[in-house]
Amino acid sequence: MSSSSRNLSQENPIPRPNLAKTRTSLRDVGNRRAPLGDITNQKNGSRNPSPSSTLVNCSNKIGQSKKAPKPALSRNWNLGILDSGLPPKPNAKSNIIVPYEDTELLQSDDSLLCSSPALSLDASPTQSDPSISTHDSLTNHVVDYMVESTTDDGNDDDDDEIVNIDSDLMDPQLCASFACDIYEHLRVSEVNKRPALDYMERTQSSINASMRSILIDWLVEVAEEYRLSPETLYLAVNYVDRYLTGNAINKQNLQLLGVTCMMIAAKYEEVCVPQVEDFCYITDNTYLRNELLEMESSVLNYLKFELTTPTAKCFLRRFLRAAQGRKEVPSLLSECLACYLTELSLLDYAMLRYAPSLVAASAVFLAQYTLHPSRKPWNATLEHYTSYRAKHMEACVKNLLQLCNEKLSSDVVAIRKKYSQHKYKFAAKKLCPTSLPQELFL
């Protein structure tokens, strides 16, 4: 390990600013996330490392909590930078880029829903589990989630019948009267605010797809540490990719970009936003306050302050309602599994070739089939509200399945650990099928 590497240990903890009295939204200061490590600037090291230096192993440790000390968490990050300085090609599952424009979309049949009778839909899957849609995790362990039965009860909706999921006009959070128009606008907006599909090869020379995965894995832990909402995480990743599309960056500033984008997304999405000093602290004070503010200005100006971006999480919420159909009790396991699969897609640079709405629809498809392999995972309701037929999702679904089944590196385990908790129904421990029958996509 390099002598200049920072090591956050229990014996010599970095002093934490006294934020407990003013920032009640943050966790206990003892439960601290170690900095990203060797792909960042080092506080006491050189800001301009020699070109021949390569990434070395780094150990990150979690500090002591007030209740009991936690075991050290070490992570070996050997990213294998090539001697030529060029990033290796990102373990692409296919060299074929699927442009959004080539995907055939179904036309919404609004007249069909307008003429159909109002259907009762009392339970909303987006409201049933606060741990998914808000940053306040469930702390009442007395609540016992009801696990859906995987047996076929014979009361499934007719596959050819479209269920009106916008019939509940009494719930203002659903915006039932405007939902169709809102999501039509989001479908147009997602095309205009997508990052380049090959920016790593065209623009970047100091970073590669593996470094991007480690950064996003670290951002997942930062979001958990400060209890930020999932929407904040998805927005931060979008800002990172869009900025990297047109700006070459060295590996020493990659963490600075990531934590700055998380700060921007938190300002946009959160009610209780961590201070700039909190984001400096989470990097082990590797970066100064002024550096974060300068990077914030650079990101905002490059994005032209266009921060409203539809992410896969936006579409996933509506698609899960469509998957629920007429069920009065939402399937929490299905929701958590779909969220897990969608979040896994953030780690894979190759998944950028798929539109966010396609990723969300594919996650619902795979979650439905994983939990109910004897049923058809796609029906007329899902086809109508997602505008995707099963055949359009084949490549994306198979890539998600590969992500779910492959043994991830020890450097990117945050998402799997997150969804192995009880509040997420242990979704990460659910075994996905090894393969998918071809008739599912006919």
From Swiss-Prot:
Give the species.
Arabidopsis thaliana (Mouse-ear cress)
* Source taxon at top rank: Eukaryota
Q: How does it assemble?
A: Interacts with CDC20-1, CDC20-2, FZR2/CCS52A1 and FZR1/CCS52A2.
UniProt entry keywords in alphabetical sequence: Cell cycle, Cell division, Cyclin, Cytoplasm, Meiosis, Nucleus
Give the range the annotation lists for the signal sequence.
none
Q: Could you tell me which InterPro entries the record lists for this protein?
A: Cyclin, Cyclin-like_dom, Cyclin-like_sf, Cyclin_A/B-like, Cyclin_C-dom, Cyclin_N, Cyclins_cyclin-box
What protein family is recorded? Answer: Belongs to the cyclin family. Cyclin AB subfamily.
Q: Where is this region: Disordered?
A: 1-72
Question: Could you tell me what this protein is called?
Answer: Cyclin-A1-2
A Gene Ontology term for the protein's cellular component: cytoplasm
